[in-house]
Amino acid sequence: VINGGTNARERGLSGGKSELALASYFGRINYDYAGRYLFSFNLRADGSSRFRKDKRWGVFPSFSGAWRISEEKFFNVKPVSNLKLRASWGQLGNQSIGSWYPTIASVSKENVVFGTAADNQILYAGYTQSKLGNKSLEWETTTVTNIGVDLGFFNNSLSFSADYFVKNTSGILRSMVLPLSVGLGAPNMNYAEVQNRGLDLEISYKGNIRDLHYSVGANVS
């Protein structure tokens, strides 16, 4: 028993032990046709010992595609050296909860007093449930959709990029708020959702003065 004594002199050992296992599998397929049509497909599976066996694995796909219009034969706009349209969609999982065993009830050491003041109130070491578990806990999932365009002018000396994205995070892992009358720590739950949207713009210029090469850029989100 770790830290099982009622006072410091009775404790011969102190410490703790925790175990966590993670396993991941990942695969990717890329396709490139004549430098004009670009596709990529990814699939990953992650397993965490934080979850029960029926909730342990999460599968997260993603794919992206691009069309380099500037490589098409019909495209003949001399100042434009690069024009590419991009789109992507993908998912990722999160299992970082802070607790190593969130699906089971936690037990902690508590001292219990027996007797009265006349009996010197003998102090005994005991254990009691301190936190509720959640058997249905599963992976938090983030889904990102992105649409973008890349432009290059004058042999790509001047470049411009624009991206619009939507990021949805569902099943966010958080502790619930319980009334104090429950008397136990709140379990972790998949009960929150957040959506973020944004637009990223970037412009850059690169050149040289004799042997001096330089580049400048700016971005805004």
Model-predicted regions and their roles:
Residues 1-221:
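Extracellular/periplasmic, surface-exposed regions of secreted and cell-surface proteins
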